[in-house]
Amino acid sequence: MAKSNEPIFWSLFSAGGMVAALFLPILMVITGFLIPNDFAPQDTLSYERVYSAVSGSNIVKLVLFAVIALPFFHWAHRFKFTLVDIGLRKIRLLLGVLCYGGAISATVITAIILWWI
């Protein structure tokens, strides 16, 4: 049986989908509706408060890393197979390299930024 890296990307795809489905909607409600409409104090998302919360806790950094990085892999997997389905089968390998390479690059950049905070 030939070895494949497909299960790794499928697991990252599903994890990114779960994060996108469970956490991103509530984050959009909080930052896009509750705080602007005065359901929370205006300084809730002030720079000083957010910076101290992120820089003071490795758990917060880990959660932010998951919420930011995993949806990149969900996007990469979905975008690659969308392009393959519309007829770009001949460059399937190139699409995989570009899409997953972009997701890996974004994940590395996210890790570097969170590490230095």
Regions found by a protein language model. Name each.
Residues M1-I117:
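Membrane-embedded alpha-helical bundles that constitute the cytochrome b-like, heme-associated redox core
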